[in-house]
Regions:
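Small beta-barrel nucleic-acid-binding modules, primarily SNase/OB-fold domains
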Residues: 1-302
Length: 302
């Protein structure tokens, strides 16, 4: 029989956050099992390979071409401004294939870059340096982090911030990722200019994904997959009402240069490298913490 305890922290019926299931790698000691965990690299978004095969990508080609037709016919729930921007890239007949091919190239670059920068001749490869932000996990249980080679204090004394760049930054520099900074996980004051500069230079030079004007950044590709599914239901006469019609977009966008906040379909007014994405649920907090100013369209002035 134990004595009654007087400390209450988690009321009955509540539970700790879950990260789902993970593969056990080994057990170091009694209280230290090691698991395998995926990392979602912060502030970057590489092309998707969810089509899995060239045939799967070709199927997306057809879906997006069909979506372009529905947009022409006014059947898709999308604003005229964003539709005008996206339509030419959806109507190419190769939007899915382009995304898949770019995704494979981005993966190959990332693998080669990691192996090269971690390698030490005659020694074991370097460990990874991992830095997380105030929101350590995403909704899929992935660790949100910046990763880089782990250098010794002596080595760090001789390296500039650019020379000890994160693998996240390397993807932007090579043009194999679109910048994807999401509040509140914003790089620090010394790192954010590096990120913006790398992304701007890659886009201006037409490297990586920016070599093709028909490129859909991965966040647009995912949104268009959702918009296709919603529009397909609408065309089929299935009931899609209210907020469900616009479930394909749930992020606002702030311009890092002016702190102006734009609606979910007005991000085209901001160059990709200056886009700060904000989930709808976080808009109030972002406006308060960053002193954002609503764009005229958000307050009915345009």
């Amino acid at each position: 029989m134990i004595e009654p305890v007087q400390v209450l922290w988690s009321p009955a019926g509540t539970s700790m956050p879950s990260l789902g299931d993970r593969a056990l790698v080994d057990v170091t000691d009694g209280d230290t099992p090691n698991i395998r965990m995926p990392i979602r690299m912060l502030s970057v978004d590489t092309p998707e390979v969810t089509a899995r095969t060239p045939e799967g990508a070709a199927a997306v080609d057809e879906k997006f071409a069909q979506l372009a037709e529905w947009i022409d016919q006014g059947k898709a729930p999308i604003s005229a401004g964003l539709a005008a921007d996206l339509h030419p890239r959806l109507a190419t007949g190769r939007a899915g294939t382009l995304q898949f091919e770019q995704g494979k190239q981005a993966s190959a670059f990332a693998k080669h870059n990691v192996e090269t920068r971690l390698a030490r001749p005659g020694q074991e490869p370097r460990n990874l340096f991992i830095r997380v932000t105030e929101t350590p996990f995403d909704d899929h249980g992935r660790l949100l982090a910046y990763i880089a080679p782990n250098y010794s204090p002596k080595e760090l004394e001789t390296l500039s911030r650019a020379e000890r760049s994160t693998f996240n930054l390397d993807l932007l520099t090579a043009g194999w990722a679109a910048p994807f900074v999401i509040f509140p996980s914003i790089p620090g004051e010394l790192d954010l200019p590096l990120l913006v500069g790398a992304a701007a230079q890659a886009r201006a030079a037409g490297t990586g994904i920016w070599s093709d004007p028909a490129t859909l950044p991965a966040y647009e590709y995912r949104a268009m997959e959702k918009l296709y599914s919603i529009t397909k239901k609408i065309v089929a006469g299935e009931p899609v009402r209210g907020a469900d019609r616009f479930a394909w977009r749930d992020r606002y966008c702030a311009d890092m240069r002016s702190r102006q906040l734009h609606g979910p379909e007005d991000y085209g007014a901001v160059p990709p490298e200056y886009r700060l994405w904000i989930w709808s649920r976080d808009v109030a907090a972002a406006v308060d913490r960053l002193n954002l100013v609503p764009a005229p369209a958000l307050v009915g002035a345009a």
